[in-house]
């Protein structure tokens, strides 16, 4: 009885980010579409060869995307937003939807990018589909079918992957009031019927249809819609219904009624669901078990997994499939490239290529292959050895964590009192202007960083180079007349990796890249041991920048929850414990910054929303320790020290009270793409502190006009008292260039100055009317 082995998807970026560099060359006009497509084809061919060489039963097709797989589905369904429809859709259409289009690059008019948000609770992003009641769907984008043909012609047995119709609808948004996007399902299903019919003609036996929303707590109309949907799209192609990121037990009674041929569940995220799934699995279905974790870098304990799966194999026989838990796009590509790791540390890890081999090894061992069973035993030994490694567990760190009290997570006085102290010290105008932290990482900075890391630049030479970039950033900000400055973070390759490199307990990699969105890749550090700060990290750079200006300089820290969410965490201790260790380290940094004369300190927490568990019933437990971790970090600040925090891609409605519970003096948030829609959360909740809703979408090359910014700030002022508003971009400016950055910030500053005058006139008029009324009554 041969066990079928497969994965849900493979990284598309290339082991050395080949796709990223090709995309960016294309966007700069340095290569044409044919050259870009050639790079994509080469990457797909290599990925399929990796899967086939390892011995997987299927090569997965359709997991490749030029920007993100949800946007690919949008193009597949012919569902391009009207503002981006210019002739027959091609790659430029796809990039316009994802990146937007400025007037200068379009003969007609500019067009805003579609919203972008996080893919469930990961650090991957997708472009949000837009729905209106007139929408139709038509299969017009051939990428999926072309890639199936490519794989077949290369000699592979193919399993295409497709985002399911219910998940596609659910992950989108209505762009008009009084309309429910679920009513579009019948039209959408017609397109899915056409897709499956085409795949059948191509000789496809199995298709993987991803419905990750089945791991959520779905409302009844959405859950009920599944039965009809899968009856309608039933075809000659067998369907593996794929779920991941959490348990599907809540939806299981509906799932087992569906007209599909198999179910995939994520046992890495929710191992407890196995018994319930086995008890209700239809007799004619296959069961794919995701036992190799696609979201981390840790070597799988294949010995333990084998012991767990053997009874399932005995019960199901060939109906048992072994798989990755989710797509491997969340893992780096290949551990073999990491020549700088010690043999011990290397033995702890497995990247995507190695995870493919783990899946195959488990399949062979389940089939009774003696050599594979023995290999499982040997392969798992480093995991056991690590549990007792003395350098992984530190008594000093454990002692501090054990001493945490409620008082440690509280500022010394309430916000109202802090605000008075801060107003006296900072002397800021109405609608103060600032940026979120980073400035463009120029090619010069990257070359110098590379030269330093390769030994071509000494530490002293590199420090002088960085000081030059900091001085330049300060000079540019003063010329723009921003109110609160930043040093620009020239020394930081990444907002998380930089702290990981300067905190004990982390391991960084050279090629551990994963895709975040589009061409944006991140290289998450790995938590390998207890975390502690051995010396100040940012104080020197911030104090140098402050010495160059009389304006206020913000110290810039990445918060404990974001560092946790944007790294690969340990699996031997809880996420809460890691967050507490990080919080204590950052608390020490806050103390040192204020002692060095930095009056404003930003503790970025852009990832706090994405860290929420998928099930709402699990939210409060997470929020309790996540908010505590932030407050521990910030609570060493004196009343006159203003603590800022920043969040992006956040949906605040469900966590607005928790955002307030952070007790940050100022919060800046991403709102420009949604045209200030995110501020609806503040209509019913009286947010007590200051807020800076973003007015410049830094993810798009478009430069916002002064009028656009004025309009956004006025919308914000309808929900937030103007005296508590700040004016700032959505996010850091690292990925932009200096000309567009300065142009956008010039408009931002001029908009703020114009609005100060307008609001001052309104205030004067109101005061005059009030005075006249008093005099009349007198």
UniProtKB/Swiss-Prot annotation:
PANTHER family: 5-METHYLTETRAHYDROPTEROYLTRIGLUTAMATE--HOMOCYSTEINE METHYLTRANSFERASE (PTHR30519). L-homocysteine binds at residues 436-438, 489, 604. One of its GO terms (biological process) is methylation. The active site is at 699 (proton donor). InterPro entries: Cbl-indep_Met_Synth_N, Cobalamin-indep_Met_synthase, Met_Synth_C/arc, UROD/MetE-like_sf. Its cofactor is Zn(2+). Zn(2+) binds at residues 646, 648, 670, 731. L-methionine binds at residues 436-438, 489, 604. This is 5-methyltetrahydropteroyltriglutamate--homocysteine methyltransferase. Catalyzes the transfer of a methyl group from 5-methyltetrahydrofolate to homocysteine resulting in methionine formation. Belongs to the vitamin-B12 independent methionine synthase family. Keywords: Amino-acid biosynthesis, Metal-binding, Methionine biosynthesis, Methyltransferase, Repeat, Transferase, Zinc. It is an enzyme of class 2 (transferase). Coiled coil: none annotated. It catalyses: 5-methyltetrahydropteroyltri-L-glutamate + L-homocysteine = tetrahydropteroyltri-L-glutamate + L-methionine. One of its GO terms (molecular function) is 5-methyltetrahydropteroyltriglutamate-homocysteine S-methyltransferase activity. Its EC number is 2.1.1.14. 5-methyltetrahydropteroyltri-L-glutamate binds at residues 17-20, 118, 520-521, 566, 610. Pfam families: Meth_synt_1, Meth_synt_2. Pathway: Amino-acid biosynthesis; L-methionine biosynthesis via de novo pathway; L-methionine from L-homocysteine (MetE route): step 1/1. Binds 1 zinc ion per subunit.
């Amino acid at each position: 009885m041969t066990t079928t082995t497969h994965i849900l998807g493979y990284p598309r970026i290339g082991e050395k980010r080949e796709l990223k560099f090709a995309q960016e060359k294309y966007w700069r006009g340095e290569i044409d579409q044919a050259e870009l497509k050639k790079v994509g084809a080469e990457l797909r061919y290599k990925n399929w060869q990796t899967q086939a060489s390892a011995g997987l039963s299927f090569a997965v097709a359709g997991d490749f995307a030029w920007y993100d797989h949800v946007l690919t589905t949008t193009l597949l369904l012919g569902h391009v937003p009207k503002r981006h429809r210019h002739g027959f859709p091609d790659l430029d259409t796809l990039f316009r939807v994802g990146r937007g289009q400025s007037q200068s690059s379009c003969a007609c008019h500019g067009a805003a990018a579609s919203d972008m948000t996080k893919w469930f609770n990961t650090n991957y992003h997708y472009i949000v589909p837009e729905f209106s009641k007139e929408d139709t769907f038509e299969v017009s984008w051939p990428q999926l079918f072309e890639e199936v043909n490519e794989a077949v012609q290369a000699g592979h047995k193919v399993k295409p992957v497709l985002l399911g119709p219910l998940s596609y609808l659910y992950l989108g948004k209505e762009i008009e009031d009084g309309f429910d996007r679920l009513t579009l399902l019948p039209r959408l299903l017609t397109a899915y019927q056409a897709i499956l019919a085409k795949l059948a003609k191509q000789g496809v036996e199995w298709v993987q249809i991803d419905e990750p929303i089945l791991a959520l707590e779905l409302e009844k109309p959405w859950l009920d819609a599944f039965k009809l949907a899968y009856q309608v799209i039933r075809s000659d192609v067998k369907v593996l219904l794929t779920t991941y990121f959490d348990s599907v037990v809540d939806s299981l009674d509906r799932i087992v009624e569906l007209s599909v041929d198999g179910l995939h569940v994520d046992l890495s995220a929710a191992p407890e669901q196995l018994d319930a799934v086995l008890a209700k699995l239809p007799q004619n279905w296959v069961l794919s078990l995701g036992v190799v974790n696609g979201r981390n870098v840790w070597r799988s304990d294949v010995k333990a997994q084998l012991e767990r799966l053997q009874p399932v194999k005995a019960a199901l026989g060939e109906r048992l499939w072994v798989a990755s838990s989710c797509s491997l796009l969340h893992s780096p590509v290949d551990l073999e490239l990491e020549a700088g790791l010690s043999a011990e540390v290397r033995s702890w890890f497995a990247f995507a290529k190695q995870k493919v081999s783990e899946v195959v090894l488990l399949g062979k061992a389940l089939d009774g292959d003696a050599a594979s069973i023995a290999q499982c035993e040997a392969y798992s030994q480093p995991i056991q050895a690590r549990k007792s490694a003395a350098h992984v567990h530190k008594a000093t760190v454990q002692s501090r964590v054990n001493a945490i009290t409620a008082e440690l997570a509280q500022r010394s006085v309430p916000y109202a009192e802090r605000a008075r102290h801060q107003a006296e010290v900072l002397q800021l105008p109405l609608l103060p202007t600032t940026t979120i932290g980073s400035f463009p990482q120029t090619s010069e900075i990257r070359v110098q960083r590379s030269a330093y890391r390769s030994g071509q630049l000494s530490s002293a030479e590199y420090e002088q180079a960085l000081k030059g970039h900091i001085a330049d950033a300060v000079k540019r900000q003063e010329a723009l007349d921003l109110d609160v400055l930043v040093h620009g973070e020239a020394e930081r390759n990444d907002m998380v990796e930089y702290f990981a490199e300067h905190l004990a307990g982390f391991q960084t990699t050279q090629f551990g890249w994963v895709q975040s969105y589009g061409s944006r890749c991140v290289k998450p550090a790995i938590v390998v041991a207890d975390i502690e700060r051995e010396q100040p990290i940012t104080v020197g750079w911030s104090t140098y920048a402050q010495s160059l200006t009389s304006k206020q300089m913000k110290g810039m820290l990445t918060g404990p929850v974001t560092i946790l969410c944007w790294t690969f965490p340990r699996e031997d201790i809880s996420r809460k414990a890691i967050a507490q260790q990080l919080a204590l380290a950052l608390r020490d940094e806050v103390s040192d910054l204020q002692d060095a004369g930095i009056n404003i300190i930003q503790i970025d927490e852009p990832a706090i929303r994405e860290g929420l568990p998928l099930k709402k019933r699990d939210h409060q437990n997470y929020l309790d320790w996540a908010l505590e971790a932030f407050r521990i970090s910030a609570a060493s600040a004196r009343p006159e020290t203003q603590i800022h925090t920043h969040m992006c891609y956040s949906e605040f409605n469900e966590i607005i009270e928790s955002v307030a519970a952070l007790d940050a003096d100022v919060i800046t948030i991403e709102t420009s793409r949604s045209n200030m829609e995110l501020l609806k959360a503040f209509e019913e909740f009286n947010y007590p502190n200051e807020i800076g809703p973003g007015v410049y979408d830094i993810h798009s090359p478009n430069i916002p006009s002064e009028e656009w910014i004025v309009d956004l700030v006025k919308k914000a002022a309808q929900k937030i008292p103007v005296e508590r508003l700040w004016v700032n971009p959505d996010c850091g400016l690292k990925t932009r260039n200096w000309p567009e950055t300065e142009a956008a910030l010039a408009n931002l500053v001029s908009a703020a100055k114009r609005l100060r005058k307008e609001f001052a006139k309104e205030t004067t008029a109101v005061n005059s009317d009030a005075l006249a009324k008093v005099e009349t009554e007198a």
